[in-house]
A protein has these predicted regions:
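Charged, low-hydrophobicity low-complexity segments
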Residues: 1-60, 265-266, 276-278, 397-435, ...
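P-loop NTPase catalytic phosphate-binding loop
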Residues: 16-20, 107-112, 116, 134-260, ...
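Low-complexity, intrinsically disordered P/S/T-rich segments
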Residues: 1-165, 216, 356
Length: 506
């Protein structure tokens, strides 16, 4: 009987769903502007002249014009040391009177030395030009993302499932949020709501607010939440823990189905070779986008880093992918664990070379010209891309177009994390009290001063034990919470009320 059944169609519930149309995107009348040949020839002359002044002869020079940058490739004469040319970066920039140039010596796989010079009047790369391109329309990636145009004016498209996670960094106002919007927009143009869900985490509160209209189509959230876009830090921890739970559940289903990846699993499910009664279900990809990750680390620290590292390490096979953006690429935010698991990096302009090294493991991001100019690193090779520009009104039009259509009844529900998992690892069990507990309580009440060092001195015990005693006193309501370096408040004023409390605890 199973042979007669037709293939399962995940899109069946929303078979009437129409993808956003291309006319929702703004067309900028930059057109294919004619290449400014005079500027190009002038720059060629200046480069040759500058190098000649320092005694470096070159055999050939050719220019490739991109939307914001022109790349001049030179071949030096035999016997010229590359390091000599690399050291002349500032001199060449001076003679070209350019904002800042970048020398790539040598160009990987080309046998030339590249000099990147910003154009006098840069072109806008519109999202429309990238999404209407033949390459994007015809690509059959699992999660295709059209980022923008490379230096040769080709559209740059990558598959998020191959990445598998992406780290975005750059100083304020250099185009990070636009980059994230470009990623989300290109996914919305290619993926049906049944095939992809997104978890949007936005500590800035305003960046992703636009996407709340597509909640019932594309977003995933905790079951009892009102808002699908997560802005509250405590909720972020719950959501991330819930995602790790979803990841473990998915791995179990994969194990039962004897497959290795979500792709194989879904193919098997579509062919109706997995029984839904045994808990099998079609799995959509889940893309987690976090804007301003540094803010989360500063407020919640390890609690957030742990689940992120876990998801980053294991979740690629079950179709969960993360895109994390931060404007502070310092080492205490982008830690080693996170770096190891985010092989693909997008670097917008940063201020210092150290920041650039933190993101890309090499300098270069500090020499970009800003406004969507970025380096995309995947493994060892760096690609310079002009990020496609998405305007807020454009995103709004797209989300409204999707939001007006019939969606699912609710947003995709993530598994609930039970209360026991939320208990802090250092939680206090009052049945397992320290033998000195009652004496310490009397001491604190007599002195009316809740300080750990007082307990240490009087009972001559170590800091750790005194700290645990303090936690137990706090749990039983004798002292208040810690307030940095100030002593804790003592809630019980006299020994008589303390004895009553201790009797009730015994």
């Amino acid at each position: 009987q199973t042979d007669q059944q037709e293939d399962y169609d995940p899109r069946k519930d929303l078979s009437s769903f129409r993808f956003p149309t291309l006319n929702l995107l703004k067309v900028y009348n930059t057109g294919d502007r004619a290449v400014n040949m005079s500027e190009q020839n002038e720059n060629k002359e200046k480069i040759i002249h500058t190098l000649r002044n320092y005694g470096i002869e070159i055999t050939s020079i050719k220019a490739t014009v991109g939307p914001t940058i022109t790349l001049y490739e030179i071949v030096p004469q035999a016997g010229v040391r590359i390091s000599k040319i690399r050291n002349l970066e500032d001199d060449i920039a001076l003679s070209l009177s350019a904002l800042g140039i970048r020398i790539i010596a040598p160009m990987p796989g080309k046998g030339t030395i590249g000099i990147e010079v910003p154009n006098k009047d840069p072109q806008i790369v519109s999202m429309q030009s990238v999404i209407t391109s033949k390459r994007f329309q015809e690509c059959d990636y699992d999660l295709p993302v059209a980022l923008g145009k490379t230096i040769t004016n080709e559209v740059f498209i990558f598959d998020l499932t191959k990445m598998p996670h992406l780290l975005v960094a750059g100083a304020t106002g250099q185009g990070k949020s636009v980059g994230l919007n470009a990623i989300i927009t290109s996914l919305l143009y290619k993926k049906h709501p049944s095939e992809m869900k997104m978890v949007l985490i936005d500590p800035k509160m305003v960046e992703f607010n636009i996407y709340s209209t597509i909640e019932k189509h594309y977003l995933a959230k905790l079951p009892d939440e009102q808002k699908a876009i997560i802005t509250d830090v405590t909720k972020v921890t719950q959501t991330l823990n819930s995602l790790t739970r979803e990841m473990d559940d998915r791995y179990e289903l994969l194990m039962k189905a004897h497959v290795r990846t979500i792709k194989e699993y879904n193919e098997k499910f579509v062919k109706r070779r997995l029984n839904p009664e045994k808990g099998h279900k079609y799995m959509p990809y889940i893309v987690v986008v976090i804007d301003e990750f540094g803010d989360l680390i500063m407020t919640a620290g390890k609690e957030i880093e742990m689940p992120i590292a876990r998801i980053a390490q294991k979740a690629r096979a079950v179709g969960m992918h993360m895109v994390i953006a931060t404007q502070r690429p310092t080492t205490n935010i982008i830690t080693g664990t996170i770096k190891a698991n985010f092989p693909a990096r997008m670097a917008f302009r940063v201020t210092s070379q150290i920041d650039s090294r933190t993101i890309l493991d090499m300098s270069g991001a500090n020499q970009l010209i800003g406004r969507g100019d970025m380096l995309f690193s995947q493994g060892s090779n760096l690609i310079r891309i002009q990020c496609a520009f998405v305007d807020t009104p454009e995103v709004e039009e797209i989300t409204q177009y999707i939001g007006k259509q019939h969606g699912y009844d609710n947003a995709f529900a993530l598994p609930e994390v039970t209360g026991e998992a939320e208990a802090v690892p250092g939680a206090v069990d009052l049945n397992d009290r320290d033998p000195l507990f009652e004496e310490a309580a009397r001491l604190i009440v007599v002195h009316q001063q809740g300080s750990t060092s007082l307990i240490q001195r009087k009972f001559s015990i170590g800091y750790n034990r005194a700290g645990r005693l303090m936690d137990q006193l706090e749990a039983s309501g004798i002292v208040g919470a810690a307030q940095g370096s100030k002593p804790r408040d003592v809630f019980i004023q006299d020994e008589y009320s303390l004895e009553k409390l201790l009797n009730s605890l015994r």
